[in-house]
Design a protein with these regions (language model features):
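Primarily secretory-pathway and cell-envelope proteins
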Residues: 2-69, 73-75, 102-172
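A short tyrosine-centered beta-strand micro-motif
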Residues: 95-97
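Short, surface-exposed beta-strand/beta-hairpin micro-motifs centered on an aromatic residue
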Residues: 82-87
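Short, acidic Ser/Thr/Gly-rich low-complexity loop/linker segments typical of extracellular
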Residues: 76-80
Length: 172
């Protein structure tokens, strides 16, 4: 009997089975930026501003770095449970985060676009903190270290968040 989290058992839930019959498949992404097939064209800055994102045990996290000015996603990152991913070359500007937590990531390819989502224990949040990576033409390098842990089904982070739904997470 395995634990109810990604990689610890081979039990397919009825929801996952229904999704598989509609073209979805289980996937174990590596940590880092998703490729452009996920619908986000990554935007890079000239300086090495970065986020270090550390995830505790029990859940993986998909993170969207959102421009405060345009409310548009500039980077879409996957961080597997128990790992740290460094997101380099964040452009100057102000950002907030959208976070999807969960287990059992599944993907479905439709044409040249790939959809992805957690299919067990999924929940979604948005940061209320604004991460300021400096003014345009500044030479100062800015870095943030984010620590994300899920304890008893809720996130315990070193930044503030509010709950959002899956649709709000998906909207760029």
């Amino acid at each position: 009997v395995g634990k109810d989290k990604q990689g610890d058992n081979n039990v397919v839930t009825p929801v996952q089975e229904a999704m598989m019959s509609n073209g979805w498949e289980l996937s174990t992404p590596e940590g880092g930026d998703f490729d452009e097939s996920m619908g986000i064209k990554p935007v890079y800055g000239l300086q090495d501003n970065y986020f270090d994102i550390t995830i505790g045990q029990g859940f993986s996290v998909a993170v969207k770095i959102m421009s405060l000015k345009e409310h548009k996603c500039i980077r879409y990152i996957f961080v597997p449970e128990g790992q740290t991913v460094t997101v380099n070359e964040i452009p100057q500007g102000k950002y907030y985060l959208k976070l999807a937590y969960g287990n059992d990531w599944m993907v479905k390819t439709e044409g040249n676009h790939t959809l992805g989502k957690f299919t067990k224990n999924a929940f979604y949040e948005k940061s209320t903190n604004i991460f300021d990576f400096g003014m345009k033409n500044s030479t100062q390098i800015v870095n943030y270290k984010l620590e994300i842990n899920v304890i008893d089904g809720s996130a315990k982070n070193n930044f503030q968040t509010i709950a959002i739904n899956e649709t709000e997470f998906e909207n760029d």
